[in-house]
Amino acid sequence: MVVETGVNKLVRLQGKIEGINSKIDEADLRRANAKSSIVEASSRLEKAEGEVASFQRRIRLVQQNLNDVTERAQMLQSKVDNLEDVSESVKQARNQYEEEEAESDEKIQNLEEEVKVKKRELEENEIKLREKERRNVVVHRDIEAATVKADAIEKRIEILENTIKNGLESIKDLEEREGRTNEKENNIAEQISFLDNKFKEVEIRIEAAERNCNVLEHNIKETSEEIKTWKHNTHAIEEEIAAMDDVGDDDTQ
């Protein structure tokens, strides 16, 4: 009985030892698992710290964006206030524009009528200008004809002068050859008188031709001045019409 009891104790002791060893193994396993958990927890902690730092950076960016948005909101509010003021000004300007538009329509009609009148005046001036130019051509032709006549008269004068000179020489020859007789003196006097009359007639014609030339030159100058005046007036009317057309286009726009 005593032996069996010792054996039983030994068995129980071995069982306890095995239980203790089993618990030690379990403890080692738990410790290993705990170390693995600690390593994993450290890794997760580092990752979490990185995520926290990232979140903090994102928070700072969000805060900065929020500040920017706040500033933009304030600017937009200021612009909205300004736009409200501008809107009121636009309303007033629109009312004023509508009032002026009615007056502008009447002004445009008046300008259109004035442009029509100016265009008619321009057409009339162009007709008068063409007539002046035609008259100028005629005057130039008359001057050319008068010049030709003057040249012919000068040639005739030269011929008459030569004739008078030859006549005087002939008279001197007759006086030297035949002496002085009353009959010859009368004939010579008649010839001289005839030649003098012819010379005076030629001088009168020359003076008339010169007067005609002077009149023609004066007419040409007056015609040229009138043409310049008409051209100047026509140019001024064209500029005035162009200015009125521009004003009408601006008012229409």
UniProtKB/Swiss-Prot annotation:
Keywords: Coiled coil, Repeat. Residues 7-253 form a coiled coil. The keyword Coiled coil applies. InterPro entries: Tropomyosin. Signal peptide: none annotated. Belongs to the tropomyosin family. The molecule is in a coiled coil structure that is formed by 2 polypeptide chains. The sequence exhibits a prominent seven-residues periodicity. Tropomyosin, in association with the troponin complex, plays a central role in the calcium dependent regulation of muscle contraction. Homodimer. This is Tropomyosin-1. It comes from Hydra vulgaris. The gene is TROP1.
